[in-house]
Amino acid sequence: MSSWASFIFLFIFSFLTSFRVFAQDPTYRYHSCPNTTIFSRDSAYFSNLQTLLSFLSSPDASSSYSSGFRNDAVGTFPDRVTGLFDCRGDLPPEVCHNCVAFAVKDTLIRCPNERDVTLFYDECTLRYSNLVVTSALDPTYVYHVCPSWATFPRSSTYMTNLITLLSTLSSPSASYSTGFQNATAGKHPDRVTGLFNCRGDVSPEVCRRCVSFAVNETSTRCPIEKEVTLYYDQCTLRYSNRNILSTSNTNGGIILANSQNMTSNEQARFKDLVLTTMNQATIAAANSSKRFDARSANFTTLHSLYTLVQCTHDLTRQDCLSCLQQIINQLPTEKIGGQFIVPSCSSRFELCLFYNQSAVTTPQPQQNSAPPPPPTSIPSPRPGLNSRFPLITCLSAVSFEKFKDLLKPGFICILIKIVSENTGKGGNSSVIIIAVVVSITALLLLFVAVFSVRTKRRKKMIGAIPLLNVKRKDTEVTEPLAENGDSITTAGSLQFDFKAIVAATNNFLPINKLGQGGFGEVYKGTFPSGVQVAVKRLSKTSGQGEREFENEVVVVAKLQHRNLVRLLGYCLEGEEKILVYEFVHNKSLDYFLFDTTMKRQLDWTRRYKIIGGIARGILYLHQDSRLTIIHRDLKAGNILLDADMNPKVADFGMARIFGMDQTEANTRRVVGTYGYMAPEYAMYGQFSMKSDVYSFGVLVFEIISGMKNSSLYQMDDSVSNLVTYTWRLWSNGSQLDLVDPSFGDNYQTHDITRCIHIALLCVQEDVDDRPNMSAIVQMLTTSSIVLAVPKQPGFFFRGRHEQVGEVGSSVDRLALCSIDDASITSVAPR
């Protein structure tokens, strides 16, 4: 071992044996706060909620943090609020307290006005509601679907039959031991059919408790809807006025994904293992009388993959196979865990044990004929339900032949073992693990310092071009790219060699050209490995490109989402400035949407899916990524479609990163595309998340109609842009006239009307009236949410006979400019 290695080893060993406690923010997993019941900040409910959260997070509750659980209630009906926290059983009191305190602060950011809230972290769960939630054994709510197109009055025969049905399903004599029961009550047209299906690994008592809880919640979540599906982690409850028995249904489901990505070099192998194991489980479940299977498979020497699949018992073998195969192919296998739940079947995979292994007969982890590949560094799996899983695991054994070997997981493994032996059986494993994390960080800092010096020397020796910030050459007053001062040197992207890009694109051969914009040209490239990429080459004559180039690298390098285009790297060599993206097989949305022939490939089902995908991508930018990012140039030309017509938001050259507490910003440099710009941005340079919401609303109008917002539309002797035209149709009750004629009769009237309604809420003139993206996604996925009445949109075109109030010339000019479809780089300051 070298002297350097010896020094580092002794330093880490001393650090580990002396270090005791280190606080860190809990790891966020998921939250649920349906906005079907909300409160105002000046209400008695909010006052009671503040008191409750203060009780739950109080440092005085030391005994509760020791036990890991506390529940409480504040106020009287109807403003009574009850809540609880539940910490993971292996955590010390101080970590439990830290998680609860963090969750209490986080809840009013993630769920600012919702009454029924659950926040999940790796270390704890926080829950509160206007309902009774004082039991730690309450089932974990996941999602519900209850379309509002079929409802019943409270005093109807259907209501009586529903009460009878729910009483039967939740009775003490129900079939909880088998985990499934169906029943029917009443006669047509008031017949109601229902069923419950419990997860195959839960006990009869857990099944009974889940079904009973779900039955009680139907009156709150879906009080007057005839067709209802409630999903919980332990069971599903369904009922309808239609026959739902022995019929496969894959509509109205939800995909949940772990926030951590599988490392890129392991994604292909991990996906193959997930699909292989899931397919084996699918066959076993279809052949099982319980229509259930759970099994595991080795991923690395110290990590196993755990999978679970299930169908409702009433499905035939073939229907079960078909249902599971359909949803398995849509699982988010780029993540280290995920699930897809639909009414008739469900599937889930994790890198940690999330089901009751003792309750299922599951095959041993599969052994390959060849030894498993050497383990590589992958994200530490997050614990699932009913599991005890280490936060850090030893991944491989390594030699100390080179200094950099000290960074490999095998060295971490040795250190963990040494410290574990020193602490004895009574040692605190959580403290040890946290100490290891801190020690590794210290080691990384030393490693970076040493190799920075060595790298600089090597670059000087071989004449390599260092990574430099892209500087503007003019003296124009500019705005910062990001509030945290990020630059291209800290983006963390891979820098490509220019010669490799030239070879991949055949020296930028015109036949490989995919398109051209204000930034420059985009080419298709193929590397020797067969990997296809999209190469975006900055035009040397572009006045705006240098700034946008750096901005795009800084922003996109930090993003990972299935509905965002992925940046693979960049190239800086001489005057060449190039971005390398994943190759998206189809072109942009406008290529299909506004072409009379190509638009026929986008039926309503696909367009509805595209709307939802775009919404989820923007939600990730605004809320779910570790940064808050405002796109500022959302339009059909910046939405790419992959081989399956899934949308990917692209072109982040205009994007801005917000600070943690920042909600809006001002700029003198208005960039983007008129027609998609929100009024406050185009006129005053004020932009926020609500600016993107406005652009999203315009985009939805274009997707539904297949028409450009920049065109002019005649109606009642008036000339309108698409936004105003839609508003007039809505006001006249003829909103379906907006629908693209290429659909024919193949569309859902309710879905299209709801999408138009949501889009009108997005384009309202007052910023505060527009919903945020989280609410929009919930509106799109939960038809039971009641929508507000939309107000007049911004940039409203009035008819010649309408009264026009006095407005400034700047507003008049911008209203006319809003029909221009050109990309704008700057306008005169106002």
Swiss-Prot record:
Spell out which residues are annotated as carrying Phosphothreonine.
T673
Which residues does the entry place in the Extracellular compartment?
A: 24-430
Q: Where is this region: Disordered?
A: 363-382
Q: Which UniProt keywords apply?
A: ATP-binding, Glycoprotein, Kinase, Membrane, Nucleotide-binding, Phosphoprotein, Receptor, Repeat, Serine/threonine-protein kinase, Signal, Transferase, Transmembrane, Transmembrane helix
Q: Which residues are recorded as binding ATP?
A: L514, G515, Q516, G517, G518, F519, G520, E521, V522, K536
Record-annotated active site: D633
Coarsely, its chief localization is: membrane
Extent of the signal sequence: 1-23
Instruction: Kindly give the CDD domains that the UniProt entry links to this protein.
Output: Gnk2-like, STKc_IRAK
Q: Where in the cell is it found?
A: Membrane
- UniProt-listed Enzyme Commission number(s): 2.7.11.-
In its keyword annotation, does this UniProt entry include Lipid metabolism? no
Ranges annotated as spanning the membrane: 431-451
Q: Which residues carry this modification: Phosphotyrosine?
A: Y581, Y681
Q: How does it sit in the membrane?
A: Single-pass membrane protein
Which residues have a glycan attached per UniProt?
N35, N182, N216, N261, N287, N298, N356, N428
Regions of compositional bias (Pro residues) in chain numbering: 370-382
User: Does the record's keyword annotation contain Repeat?
Assistant: yes
Family named by the database record:
Belongs to the protein kinase superfamily. Ser/Thr protein kinase family. CRK subfamily.
**What is the official name of this protein in its record?**
Putative cysteine-rich receptor-like protein kinase 23
Which species is listed as the source?
Answer: Arabidopsis thaliana (Mouse-ear cress)
